[in-house]
């Protein structure tokens, strides 16, 4: 019998947010991608299953996971086709890519590049442990709950590039397109 379940969801369930920062009170809107849609459907199935089969679940709505554990057992691998900024950065630093394309410099941000909330994979693992403890200790307020998992602070693409360069001592070849 299943008593407790943790679902790895995504902030993409919010669609195009009305305001920032995005809180758990923000409405779930039409997803902008098949990935976001799959997370919305997953949450709906789990919520209905919790009611029908009397078990508890928490959906953790990840923002943008980055980084690696010092053991290198979890985290970014600069292989394959990247799906977000950090693998593009690491592939450029490793020489797999000649140049990093930065898409746009006309966003309403301090440097004109898009801003995202990033969460380190170790902090994400800690969120899973906290969610599991909440369920095991029966501290949940309802049988299906959801929590945003991010830093709560946004970083622009250029800020991420500059932070990577500083931390790694590597200069990245990038171009605004």
Task: Describe the function of each predicted region.
Residues 1-5, 54-56, 99, 141-145:
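Active-site loop of short-chain dehydrogenase/reductase
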Residues 4, 13-59, 64, 73-84:
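Catalytic helix-loop patch of NAD(P)-dependent Rossmann-fold dehydrogenases
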Residues 5-7, 58-61, 117, 148-150:
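Structural signature of the Rossmann-like NAD(P)-dependent dehydrogenase/reductase core
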Residues 10:
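Residue(s) in the substrate-gating loop at a strand-loop-helix junction
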Residues 14, 66-69, 153-155:
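Feature marks short, surface-exposed loop/turn motifs that line or immediately flank catalytic pockets
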Residues 18-20, 69-74, 114-115, 161:
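Short aromatic-enriched loop/helix-cap "lid" or pocket-rim segments at secondary-structure transitions
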Residues 69-82, 89-92, 98:
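Hydrophobic, Gly/Ser/Ala-rich alpha-helical and linker tracts in large acyl-processing enzymes
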Residues 86-177:
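C-terminal substrate-binding subdomain of Rossmann-fold SDR/epimerase-dehydratase oxidoreductases
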């Amino acid at each position: 019998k299943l008593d407790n379940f943790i679902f790895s969801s995504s902030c993409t369930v919010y669609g195009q947010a009305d305001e920032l920062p995005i809180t758990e009170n923000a409405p779930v809107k039409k997803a902008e991608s098949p990935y976001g849609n799959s997370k919305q459907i997953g949450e709906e199935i789990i919520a209905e299953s919790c009611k029908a089969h009397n078990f508890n679940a928490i959906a953790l709505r990840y923002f943008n996971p980055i980084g690696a554990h010092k053991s290198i057992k979890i985290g970014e691998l600069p292989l394959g086709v990247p799906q977000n900024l950090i693998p593009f950065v690491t592939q450029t630093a490793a020489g797999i890519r000649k140049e990093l394309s930065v898409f746009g410099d006309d966003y309403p941000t301090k440097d004109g590049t898009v801003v995202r909330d990033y969460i380190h994979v170790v902090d994400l693992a800690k969120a899973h442990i906290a969610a599991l403890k909440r369920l095991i200790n029966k501290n949940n307020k309802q049988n299906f709950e959801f929590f945003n998992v991010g830093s709560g602070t946004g970083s622009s693409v250029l800020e991420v590039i500059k932070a990577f360069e500083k931390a790694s001592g590597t200069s990245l070849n990038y171009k605004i397109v």
